[in-house]
């Protein structure tokens, strides 16, 4: 049985988050949490929160044993970009796109 946790609209680019997600794909949840705890990247903290949520969902909703769980699926999708304006020289302006992403984590035995 797979249990899912989804975090939507995270303020970090999907490209940066996928780098960390690739490190924990297919690992046991204990090993994945250990990797995320000691990773210096911002995305690691966000993914750790998602993995912990998936573990809690599996324990509460499905009555799963935490020691047997592993990350079966993890993917990061691009979400909406926030368009912002940045003032430049001589009265001009540039558009800045602040990226967001959706994170989906599935855990199972």
UniProtKB/Swiss-Prot annotation:
Keyword rRNA-binding found: yes
UniProt entry tagged with the keyword rRNA-binding: yes
Record keywords: Ribonucleoprotein, Ribosomal protein, RNA-binding, rRNA-binding
Q: Biological process (GO) annotations?
A: translation
GO-annotated cellular components: cytosolic large ribosomal subunit
Among HAMAP family, the record links this protein to: Ribosomal_uL22_B
Indicate what this protein is called per its UniProt record. Answer: Large ribosomal subunit protein uL22
Question: Gene name?
Answer: rplV
């Amino acid at each position: 049985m797979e249990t899912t946790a989804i975090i939507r609209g995270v303020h970090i680019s999907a490209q940066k988050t996928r780098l960390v997600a690739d490190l924990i794909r297919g690992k046991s949840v204990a090993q994945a949490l250990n990797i995320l705890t000691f990773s210096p990247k911002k995305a690691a903290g966000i993914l750790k929160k998602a993995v912990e949520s998936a573990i809690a969902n599996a324990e509460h909703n499905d009555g799963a044993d935490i020691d047997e769980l592993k990350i079966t699926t993890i993917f990061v999708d691009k979400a909406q970009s926030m368009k912002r304006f940045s003032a430049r020289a001589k009265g001009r302006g540039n558009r800045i796109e602040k990226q967001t992403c959706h994170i989906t984590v599935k855990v199972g035995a």
